[in-house]
Structure formats: structure tokens, C-alpha cells
Amino acid sequence: MVKNTVKHVDSSKHLEKVASLIKEGKVKKICVMVGAGISTAAGIPDFRSPETGIYNNLQRFNLPYAEAVFDLSYFRKNPRPFYELAHELMPEKYRPTYTHYFIRLLHDKRLLQKCYTQNIDTLERLAGVPDKALIEAHGSFQYSRCIECYEMAETEYVRACIMQKQVPKCNSCKGLIKPMIVFYGEGLPMRFFEHMEKDTKVCDMALVIGTSLLVHPFADLPEIVPNKCQRVLINREPAGDFGERKKDIMILGDCDSQVRALCKLLGWSDELEKLIDTSVETLTEEISLLSVDSTIEKNASEQKKDDNSVNPFTKIEEKKKDEVTLLVSDDE
């Protein structure tokens, strides 16, 4: 439960405390736990805002209820609303924020135990957080599979369908393909449960950023860390049970602003900016290539379209080995 007794939080003082713990080497294994609040600065709308939220923008589909877009039984009947949403959330349209790159910087400095994210936008990956350091608790667009035969689908094929606002179908059984995003009633990825106990036991700081901690079991993560672990919340408002432990640190405000202030105290500002500049240049080149690919695929589709085909593209040509893929998985 969120504490209603929090009257005043001295965020500046608390930022200095966090910076001191890191600079003095008292914190060496940081578990970062993030939510939608770190991606709104990238332009990705949240789900429930009255005027601009994703659910509000899906009203034109006359959904029986807003969350039906993530309901598997409804998806089987009408997958189009989900793929309209998927089109809006395609990573090509967005760039990682300062907070995403801060997480990458923690990894580069060997301070990141793991990043647990509720977000499905893959911006952590685009910022360069490697797969081995990332737990996408609610899944992502990184992988897709058929909901009937469970055959994995080619990422490029699914991406091309989404870009053209088409519903991808399985090449083997013609069943519906769904990105491996956790829908209502589905369990979280096994990887979440396999790592959460170990990570929460060994981490010496639980850094929670941009989440109201309302969705379980993700919301349990900061609650199960041992009392000796320093818990830090960076969010616009109090969340979860923060404030119940004597050592809890709450830094209230905009995520990016507070993260940049923390980097300044740590002396990391130049490194963060350099990391962003380098990454933005690379991403721009990659997304430019993907835009060309999408046009080629669309033209090929129009030329080869078969009236009996259930797919928007009759064939996705084999990619050259040196072609850049947007959703990169670090296998090192």
C-alpha cells in the first residue's frame, strides 16, 4: 500500500545520498526496476490517461472493455485492435530516453545486477542493455509465435506486417501470430521467476524508476529485497510500500530530470551524453535501413499478391548477413 503520510520529500538531499553510496563503493549490485514512466519522455503514451492514453485511442474499435486489446480470447476473435496498437508502439518511431541510457551506463560500469522492466517497447534493448542483463517481465515485441501451433515467427515478417497494419499469420498452420507480450490470464516469462529470487537476494540497491507498482507479481520485487538492501524510488509520486522501511529513499519528480541530476552528482554527465550521441547516430542509420526494407517489402507484396494468400506478404526475402536488425539481442 502507498503511504499517505508522506508530507515532504527532499529530493536533492536524497539524490546526494544515492550518489554518495555509489561513489564510495557501498553499492555494487543494483537491481533496476522500471515502468512506463521512463518511456513517456520518448513520446510513448501511457495506457490510462483520459485524453492521450492508449486505451482512449482504441475506443473507435468499440472494445467491450479497454483491456480487451490484451485479452487472448478477444484477440482470437478480433486481432486488429491489438495490431493497431502494435503499429503505434513500433520501436522505429521512438528513441530511448536519458533513463534508458543511464541503465546502460550502469551496465557498462559493472554496477547493474539486472534490469527488470514492465515495458514492452524494447527501448532498453535499443539503448544497448544486453539480453543477459534484462528481464522483460511482461514480454516484448522482440519475439513472436503462433497462438495455435506455437511455431516461432520471423521477426522481420512480423515487423513488416505491423508496419503495414496487417495481421500476420503462421506460415505452417495459418493461425494468428502474437508477439510474446503477456496478455491477461497468461503467466509471466519463466525467466522472470528464475532470476528474481537470486537477484533480489544479492542486490545491495533496488532502484525503482517510473512505476506506480500496482501490477503484481512485478510489484513484489522491491518488497522482497532484504532489509539490508537500500531501496530507492524515482517517480512522480510515492509508490508501493516505499516509506515503510527506515532506509527508504524517495526522489519525487520527472524520471529523466532526476536521473540527469544524479549523473551530474556522480560525475557521469559527459559519459552519458557521449553514449547517447553515439547511440543516436547508430540508431538513425539502422532505422533508415529498415524504412527502405519496409518499402521494398510493400512493393514486393503488391507485385506478388495472391488472392488466396492469408498473409500480406507472400515471401520475405532472405536477408544479407550484414543487414542491420532493429531489435538486437546481445549474445556475448
Swiss-Prot record:
Binding site for NAD(+): 35-55, 118-121, 210-212, 235-237, 255
Residues annotated to bind Zn(2+): C146, C149, C170, C173
Enzyme class per UniProt: transferase
Requisite cofactors: Zn(2+)
Annotated transmembrane regions: none
E.C. number: 2.3.1.286
Subcellular location: Cytoplasm; Nucleus
Cystine crosslinks: none
Boundaries of every Deacetylase sirtuin-type domain copy: 7-269
Main subcellular location of this protein, as a coarse class: cytoplasm
Catalytic site: H138 (proton acceptor)
GO cellular component: chromatin; chromosome, subtelomeric region; cytoplasm; cytosol; mating-type region heterochromatin; nucleus; pericentric heterochromatin; rDNA heterochromatin
Family the entry assigns: Belongs to the sirtuin family. Class I subfamily.
Function: NAD-dependent histone deacetylase, which could function in telomeric silencing, cell cycle progression and chromosome stability.
Annotated protein name in UniProt: NAD-dependent protein deacetylase hst2
Native source organism of the sequence: Schizosaccharomyces pombe (strain 972 / ATCC 24843) (Fission yeast)
